[in-house]
Amino acid sequence: MRALLLLLILLGLPALAAETVNDVTGLNPIRVERVLAPTELQQIVAAVKNHPGPISIGGGRFSMGGQTATEGALQLDMRDFDQVLAFSAERREIRVQTGITWREILEYVDRYDLSPQIMQSYANFTVGGSLSVNVHGRYVGEGALIGSVRSIRLVLADGVLVDASPQHNSELFHGAIGGYGGLGVIVEATLGLAENSRIARESQVMPLSQYRAWFDREVRGHSDLVLHNGILYPDRFDKVRAVSYRRTDAALTETARLTPADRSYHLQKAGIRLTSASRTGRMLREAALDPLLFRGTQVQWRNHEASLDVRELEPIAGPDFSFVLQEYFVPPAQLERFVGELARLTGQHQANLINVSIRHAKADPGSLLAWAPQEVFALVLYYRQGSSVAERERAAAWTRDLIDAALACGGRYYLPYQIHASREQFLAAYPRAPEFFALKQRVDPAYKFRNRLWDTYLPPGADWPLAMPHRSL
C-alpha cells in the first residue's frame, strides 16, 4: 500500500484516509481503506494496476445496497473524471469520461438541439453509474441504456485499456454494461443522441384493467410520442394515470431549455409527505394533489424534462427512516397478475408503499445480466421503511416475496437496490450469471473488482462457474 500511495502522490491523485462511505439511503455504511478521486485516465490505470487489494467503483452513490463499495477496498470516486472528449452533431454522438453527470451532458448538447437518446428520469447520476446498472428511462420505443451505447473503454484488473462495442470485444461490452463494476472500470463511453424536440404533456386516468389495451393502441408504435409512464395508485392498485409527452410545434408554456438547478419541488415533496403519512394521504394524493400537478397544458423542451433533479425525492433518509426503491420487470401479458400479487403482498407485509411507476422497455437480448431479455413492463416501487433491524427484516421478507411473484410471472427484479434476494432467486432471475462469472474469472482472476453485490452472490474463493447452478425461468 505504501508503494501505491507514493505512486498516487507522484501522479497528483487525491488519496483520502480510511473512511466510511454510504449511499443515499444511509442504510449501508461501509468502511473502505482509501477513497481516490481521479481526474486523469493514467491515475485510474496506475491505481488499478498497482493496488494489491479489492477495488470498488463509485459515482453518484444512488444505488441502495452497497454496490459501490466493500469493506477494506480502495474506492475509486469517479465524480471528478468528467470531461467531454469528442462530439459530433452530424453523427449524433458524444464521447465522455464516465464521471460526468447527465446534467452536464444536457448542458453541453442542448446548444445543438440534441438530447441523450436514453437516460434515467433524473440527471444527477453519473454516466458510469448508469452504465454499470444498465438504466432505463421513460422513452417510448426504447429500453435499457445499452441500446444507445456505441462503445465503451474499460480498464481491466491488470491495468490494460480495452475498447469494446457491440461488434468488437462484444462479450466485454455486454458484460460490463449492467455488470455492476465486476469486470473493470468503465472510463469512457460513446453515447447516441436524439433531437431535442418540443413535447406536450397528456394525462388521463383509467382502470388498470384497461391500461394494457390502451397502451397497445395509443402508445406502442407511435413515433410522435417521446416519453410515457403510468402512475399506479396504492392502496387499491386499480387505477392508472397514463402520462405521455408528444412531439409538438405548439408554443412553449415553459421557455427554459433546462430545468433550473435551483428549482423548487415543493408540490412533489408535499405529495411524498402526504402519501407516506397514511392511507388517507394516499387517497388525497390520487383525488386532489395529482389532478393539481397534471392540470392544464404543458409544452416544454425534451431536455427540460430530462434535466429533473433527484432533489424532488428529498428527504431520502432521516435518523430512523429511509425512502427506498425496488423494481420488477414482467412480460406485458403478466402485468395485471403481478399487480394483484403486489397489492396482496404489500397489505400482508404492511409495507408503506408510496408510489408505483409503470414504464415500458423493449427487449435487451445481449446483456449478460439483462433485466429485459424480452419486452417488459417495469414497475418502480417507492416506499418508506424504518432503519431498525426489525424494520429491515420486514422489508427484506416483503422483497423476497415480491421477487418470487415476479419470477412466477416470468419476470425479473432489478439489482441496484437493497440486497435481499436469496442466491437461488438471483440465479433464477439472471440465468446467464454463470457466463458473467466465467468472464470475470478470465479478466479478473484475482477477484480485484468487488462490492457488496458480488460479495453476496459471488463470494471470494468460490468455484465460480461451477458453484452457480444454471436454473432457467
Locate predicted features.
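Substrate-recognition/cap regions that form aromatic- and gly/pro-loop-enriched pockets
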Residues: 301-428
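Glycine-rich N-terminal segment of FAD-binding domains in flavoprotein oxidoreductases
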Residues: 27-120, 134-139, 358
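Activity-critical C-terminal alpha-helical subdomain
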Residues: 312, 407, 411-473
